[in-house]
Amino acid sequence: MKEQHLGSGVLLRAANISDLPELLRVCLETGDSGKDATHLHKLPNLVGEIYVAPYVIHEPKFASALLAGERVVGYLLGVLDTKAFEDVLLEKYWPIVKAKYQKIDYELTPSDQELIKELNKQGFSDESLTAKYPSHLHIDIVEAHQGAGYGKSMIAFLLDELKLAGSSGVHLHMSASNDRARSFYKKFGFIEVLEDANECIMGLTF
């Protein structure tokens, strides 16, 4: 991807493997519905190993890092074909991460316990969802840089990239209680597709 200058020294560029430590940090610092979740975890990298690393490693074409100066302050992650991506992860990624966390010899926090459950149930998205919304995306920006318009520019950029690549629709997962995010995505035309007490899946067709 071409670098996108978003103003005030903020840059969106392609993410790479060397960015992973910083991307994992951002994932942790936004892991509590956009707020810092560091205090909730004894396994600081696990949240990012579930929600960020798979994209950078196995779908780098649509993985971007947001930088303020030299510091990574956000990321934008996309997948063109969710089903194909999940096939790859099931074979090449999840077994490695599961093995890493198989034997933990100390008490975990409730948040870490939930992540371990999430890790162990990784599988496939509902076919009715991916049939209509085959692509998906994930974005996070640290709290100090939220509300500056960067997220809007980032999402618009990725939606254009997915459309150009031939996608017919995209979905995303978010906390059902995150009303701010819900309003944000609705401005792009996303609608609620599936929802329960904890999670909302929103979708957009092209």
Regions found by a protein language model. Give the residues of each.
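Conserved GNAT acetyl-CoA-binding A-motif
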Residues: 133-135, 162-175
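Conserved GNAT-fold acetyl-CoA-binding loop/helix
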Residues: 32-51, 89-98, 102-107
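Conserved acetyl-CoA-binding loop-helix of GNAT-fold acetyltransferases
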Residues: 138, 147-164, 183-187
